């Protein structure tokens, strides 16, 4: 049976996958089929805010909740799930960063190029905290084993 931290980390992973898919597809949509932009009018600022608020920020909040729920030590599979979530964020935002120069200037606005960098930094922070939690939990288990001897 899985505990609450594992379920929340799985939720974070699911949101990260959804965010990655939405961001990559949205940025490719802004490039357009022939590189001239989308064939229909779209408000890129509104769509980007919607994508971030539906899946990007909730993924980060759920990851932070997992760290808050861990009292003394982290479970190995929970931290591995969080590291996978962070890797998905980092890799997908690296792909988005490579797509940004191809976007038509008519659809370009100030935050369009900054958002991927924010989520790369967030992914690095999640991976670092998860690795720290994993290392701390190993040390915690060792000290308990030493006390039982």
Tell me what each language-model feature is.
Residues 1-22, 149:
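Cytosolic juxtamembrane helix and N-cap/initiation of the first transmembrane helix
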Residues 5-12, 103-147:
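Alpha-helical membrane-associated segments of multi-pass integral membrane proteins
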Residues 7-14, 30-56, 80, 112-119:
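Transmembrane alpha-helix entry/boundary detector in multi-pass membrane proteins
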Residues 13-21, 81-93:
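Hydrophobic alpha-helical membrane-insertion segments
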Residues 22-36, 95-104:
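Membrane-helix interface motif
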Residues 46-64, 89, 123:
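Generic alpha-helical transmembrane segments
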Residues 64-89:
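Loop-to-transmembrane helix junctions at the membrane interface
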Residues 85-109:
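Hydrophobic alpha-helical transmembrane segments of integral membrane proteins
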């Amino acid at each position: 049976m899985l505990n609450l931290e594992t379920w929340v980390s799985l939720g974070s992973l699911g949101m990260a996958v959804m965010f990655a898919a939405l961001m990559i597809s949205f940025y490719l949509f802004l490039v357009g089929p022939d590189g001239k932009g989308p064939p229909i009018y779209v408000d890129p600022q509104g769509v980007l805010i919607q994508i971030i608020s539906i899946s990007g920020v909730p993924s980060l909040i759920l990851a932070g909740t997992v760290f808050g729920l861990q009292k003394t030590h982290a479970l190995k599979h929970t931290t591995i799930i969080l590291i996978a979530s962070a890797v998905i964020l980092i890799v997908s935002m690296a792909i988005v960063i490579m797509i940004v120069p191809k976007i038509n200037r008519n659809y370009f606005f100030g935050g369009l190029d900054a958002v991927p960098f924010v989520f790369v930094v967030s992914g690095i922070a999640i991976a670092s905290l998860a690795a720290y939690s994993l290392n701390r939990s190993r040390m915690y288990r060792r000290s308990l084993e030493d006390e039982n001897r």
